[in-house]
């Protein structure tokens, strides 16, 4: 399925996205097989020395699913085709999740470099380059003033992803990295499926991104405001917040329950309520 013409790339991306949305929602073994064929035909990359280093790292960490290692003074990560033993609501079977993630990363990077660069793809594991520090850690290590521009870039990167017709699935700030030297945002962990079957996945993306920020219980909303400004800086995506507000209104009963339960300070529930309140009170810019 190799495509060399730049004129056919947009059509291919739309077709790939339509198929991927079906896979996310139906979790079909047939389309899982399609992903495997697509990935293998186009992207099998084999650096024998790198593969040997990766296999050695796996041998030393046989029970781990994600393994960092160093090869030729460069930091890499291995992600293996095995279950993490949790979060079955958001994630699929190990095989489906593995091939979905490979497909998503490679497809996204064809259009815009916002996924980790895949340097080695094997039947049972993927090797990607290290992409920097998670935003969750950035917010803890740096001052608010130092972090604002980084979160602006994160919001802009998410809008850029959406503007190309893609979505992440769960863009939590622990799975978004900042590479200071390259001044680059990267989204990790692409194996999540769409949890709300009748909702636009990009709308869910934006809500979950904000909710992951509110989970941190920062004393102010300055970093969240910066991320929102970054998202709104891409004109084509400005209407996305209206979609999020519509989503909240369409599921008002669920959010009303979250509001009542927020008094117990369960962070997952509280952060949902805080996100909904923030979005509903957000003025259009």
Task: List where the protein language model places each region.
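Juxta-kinase regulatory segment immediately upstream of eukaryotic protein kinase catalytic domains
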Residues: 31, 39-54
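ATP-binding glycine-rich loop module of kinase domains
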Residues: 62-97
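The N-lobe alphaC helix and its flanking beta3-alphaC-beta4 segment of protein kinase-like domains
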Residues: 93-108
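Conserved kinase catalytic-core helix
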Residues: 107, 111-112, 138-174, 206
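Conserved structural core of kinase catalytic domains
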Residues: 116-151
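Conserved protein kinase catalytic/activation segment
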Residues: 175-187
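C-lobe/activation-segment region of protein kinase-like
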Residues: 186, 191-284
């Amino acid at each position: 399925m190799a495509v060399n013409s730049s004129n056919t790339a947009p059509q291919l991306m739309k077709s790939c996205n339509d198929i991927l949305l079906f896979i996310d929602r139906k979790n079909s073994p047939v389309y899982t097989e399609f992903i495997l064929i697509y990935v293998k035909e186009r992207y099998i990359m084999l650096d024998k020395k790198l593969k040997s280093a990766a296999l050695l790292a796996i041998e030393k960490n046989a029970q781990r699913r994600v393994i960092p290692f160093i090869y030729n003074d460069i930091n890499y990560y291995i992600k293996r085709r095995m279950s993490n033993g949790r979060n079955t609501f958001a994630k699929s079977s190990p095989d489906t999740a593995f091939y979905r993630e490979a497909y998503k990363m490679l497809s996204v990077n064809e259009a815009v470099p916002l996924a980790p660069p895949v340097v080695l793809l094997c039947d049972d594991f993927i090797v990607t380059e290290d992409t920097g520090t998670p935003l969750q850690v950035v917010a803890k290590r740096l001052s608010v003033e130092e972090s604002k521009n980084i979160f602006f870039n994160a919001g802009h990167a998410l809008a850029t992803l959406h503007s190309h017709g893609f979505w992440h699935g769960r863009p939590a700030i622990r799975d978004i990295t900042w590479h200071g030297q390259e001044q680059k945002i990267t989204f990790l962990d692409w194996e999540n499926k769409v949890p709300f079957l009748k909702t636009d996945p990009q709308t869910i993306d934006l809500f979950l991104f904000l909710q992951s920020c509110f989970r941190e219980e920062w004393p102010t909303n300055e970093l969240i405001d910066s991320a929102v400004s970054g998202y709104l800086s891409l004109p084509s995506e400005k209407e996305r917040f209206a979609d999020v507000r519509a989503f909240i209104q369409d599921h008002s009963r669920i959010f009303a329950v979250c509001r009542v339960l927020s008094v117990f300070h369960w962070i997952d529930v509280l952060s949902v309520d805080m996100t909904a309140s923030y979005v509903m009170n957000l003025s259009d810019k």
